[in-house]
Amino acid sequence: VILVDVNVLVYAFRRDAPNHQAYADWLKELIDSDTAFGMADLVLSGFVRIVTHPAIFDPPSTVEHAISFANQIHRHPRCASIAPGPRHWDIFTRLCRETCATGNLVPDAYLAALATESGTDWITADRGFARFRGLRWRHPFD
């Protein structure tokens, strides 16, 4: 099972994002396939936060449009909701310590711990996730 990062959703959603069409095609292929995939509420809320942020996009997406897109994914029959389990906090704190994660790297460590604990492959456009020991990750186009 794969778990998809915020950036992949943003690039697939926003027509003005870099490589939008390639990401949109990748996501459509995933959704149209028979493959199960995971999604975390933190990823979906992060997606809504980013695409509706006026300092990031001009014009920003409407909340309704962003939530509608997120709901299509979240409610998909092959989408499994991935949530922190009993080992998550220990994995998260280990990753924070090992990488000296501070500031904006802290949520990355949180998501890396979520993928690690759940045994999913993390799909992201951010190659910086390579810093997290034990995380299975790949770029969607690799």
What are these regions (language model features)?
Residues 60, 78-123:
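Active-site neighborhoods of divalent-metal-dependent phosphate/nucleic-acid chemistry enzymes
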Residues 1, 112-142:
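Acidic, PIN/NYN-like endoribonuclease modules and their adjacent C-terminal/linker elements
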Residues 54-57, 99-100, 139-142:
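Short, hinge-like loop/turn segments at secondary-structure boundaries
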Residues 38-41, 82, 124-125:
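Short beta-strand segments at enzyme active-site cores
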Residues 1-39, 54-68:
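Short, well-structured N-terminal submotif of metal-dependent ribonuclease cores
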Residues 8, 43, 87-88, 110-111, ...:
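Alpha-helix capping/helix-boundary segments
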Residues 18, 32-35, 56, 75-79, ...:
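Generic structural signal for secondary-structure transition and capping sites
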